């Protein structure tokens, strides 16, 4: 086993760890550990809400989750010799839930997925499913099942939802400027268009005093992906993957977490993956001056691993950029098209005995593929959502609904 450079006690909050992590992006968060280029190491991660969700049959905890401290990230890990303009190579060697443990903490033999309430985060289909729901998933090696979504069994593509490097002061200022401008276009929207810096709930690693206050005042929230990486939620970012992260500060300052047991493309219900605590083993290296050499100016480059389950048969649901309720055609609207593809898949699954909420959870947690099939040639954007029809879901599940919160 590689050296553990960031460890967590899953029975404790991230705030109470021997070396705490953080939940904001900021260039001045102190390093939690230092590694050399070419080294292999393990990072242990808390579940992203820091233990707010329990293994029970009520979705009240999902409904009432406090998003101010999310995501709880492990790190930052300083890489010796990394300088602005370099590329940080990160290889994922292994990843999984808490090893050989069954217990009350998320990742100890179980995980969860949820539909967030519209008034507290929402999801991709929040106008159709505005209430909170939750499903608990039990892990059986590489597979998982849920008492709240009967008849379903997945082979998980385990992956981290969130990893990234620290922003420079200038880049952080750009983030805050553009996201505040977006919020200003519709400041009363529910859910909000973006999340500005928030002092409440800020954790800045070992920072204290004036430094912690500066991090709280200006630190970027971790919900969106940005130039540094961040919350990409790419299901194929699993064992065997390689990522080229841009470096913006000395040492790169790599951080991450938000581990997932399984997820569909898009993580459409926001808390849509099967969330878990656990570990990730990594190898890191550097390409000096790599950002200029390889034209990496705005976002990381990903090379997905090849360990996902191989499915030879699929059902594919098509969505087009048409508002069917109003009979209105939109021009190349990929968001509308994917929403329609998901709604079409849900209506199909409901015919097999699932509730709409269960079907929504299935799309968020099963390894479905979403893709843009046509745009310019048809003017009406076409998106597909593909699901495996056999061995994943039963055709006659019991109608036991997922845990519900009102």
Swiss-Prot record:
Residues 387-406 are annotated as: Disordered. Its EC number is 3.5.1.4. Residues 387-399 have a biased composition (Low complexity). The lineage of its organism: Bacteria, Bacillati, Actinomycetota, Actinomycetes, Mycobacteriales. Keywords: Hydrolase. It comes from the Bacteria. This is Acetamidase. It catalyses: a monocarboxylic acid amide + H2O = a monocarboxylate + NH4(+); acetamide + H2O = acetate + NH4(+). Allows acetamide to be used as a sole carbon or nitrogen source. It holds the Pfam family FmdA_AmdA. InterPro entries: FmdA_AmdA (IPR004304), FormamaseFmdA (IPR054833). The gene is amdA. Belongs to the acetamidase/formamidase family. GO terms for molecular function: amidase activity. It comes from Mycolicibacterium smegmatis. It is an enzyme of class 3 (hydrolase).
